[in-house]
Amino acid sequence: MYDRHEVSVKVALYSSDGKRTLLMRHWGDAGFGLPGGHIDAGEMPDEALERELREELGITIDATPADFYVRDPYDTTAKNHKIILGYTATIDGDIELPDQACDGSEAGPVWLTRAELRLLTKSRQATGIFC
């Protein structure tokens, strides 16, 4: 049994042409993930997603609510049970992404093609392809 349940929101953001997905690069070797984050006390999931995207990317979107729900697959021994509410959205136009180091030393958003996503799922060492 878990001591606590943590709920967060994540969104799969697609480019308007459907060829790219926006991921957040984590610091150093921590890999990549979907934009989003924890739901604060008193927040509804949609409000949390709106706040997280404003904080992380400076954008507002219309997301399709809760397309998927998952338990954190990386946390099998923790006392906390993490539930992720998933959303999807398409970004009309493009968003301005900050310049980042190609060595993975900087965190932030990156656009990835399907081929890059496939390579990333095969090898967590694939950070050089994103420059």
PLM regions: where:
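Unchanged
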Residues: 39-63, 71-126
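A short beta-strand-loop micro-motif that forms or neighbors metal/cofactor-
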Residues: 128-131
